[in-house]
């Protein structure tokens, strides 16, 4: 099951279940305060001295089946080449969790390394399914990451997708949107 949520709602649940073993994966320096285990491909062990830190090396996540009560993957999946395998790994190590992803709009507005994000996402509210396609840059980015964070306070639901999952992360690959069908929009050229 996959459904929309908010990080505020997720945190309220986590704070009521302090006995849960919670993993925050790929969070860099911004781990969820309720996480008991932090995992990343970079070594942040010096930063997370008060929590268990696990450095990820390779595709397989170094955890036992259903080791965690809850897994947080915020702004991670869009970076992973084999996202399908990663989703299966999340489902293997926990039975529920929270996923946060940039929306297609948010991903097009923000200046980032153009090769950093591989995938585009939107959520089909009728089917409760994550729709995934290769990222297409349809708008010349004009907002910095720092500015986007400020915008998120007001336009969060337009810039990010927040999902809670239990047992299974339902998704569908949809490659119907093709770059060649669009002329890239540049707001700088409009003025």
Which role does the model predict for each range below?
Residues 84-92, 96-191:
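S-adenosyl-L-methionine-dependent methyltransferase catalytic module, highlighting the catalytic core
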Residues 11-106:
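Conserved SAM-binding loop
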Residues 1-9, 50:
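Conserved SAM-binding loop and adjacent beta-strand
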């Amino acid at each position: 099951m996959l459904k929309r949520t908010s990080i505020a709602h997720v945190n309220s649940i986590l704070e009521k279940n302090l006995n849960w073993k919670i993993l925050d994966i790929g969070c860099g320096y911004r781990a969820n305060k309720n996480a008991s285990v932090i995992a990343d491909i970079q070594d942040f062990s010096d930063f997370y001295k008060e929590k268990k830190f696990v450095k990820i090396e390779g595709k397989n996540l170094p955890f036992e089946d259903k080791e965690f009560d809850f897994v947080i993957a915020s702004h991670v999946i869009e970076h992973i080449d084999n996202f399908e395998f990663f989703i299966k790994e999340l489902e293997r190590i926990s039975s529920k969790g929270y996923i946060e992803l940039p929306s297609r709009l948010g991903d097009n507005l923000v200046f980032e390394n153009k090769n950093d994000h591989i995938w585009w996402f939107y959520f089909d509210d009728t089917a409760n399914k994550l729709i995934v396609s290769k990222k297409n840059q349809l708008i010349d980015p004009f907002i910095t990451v720092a500015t986007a964070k400020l915008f998120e306070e007001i336009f969060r639901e337009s810039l990010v997708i927040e999902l809670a999952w239990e047992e299974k992360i339902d998704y569908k690959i949809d490659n119907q949107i093709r770059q060649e069908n669009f002329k890239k929009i540049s707001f700088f050229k409009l003025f």
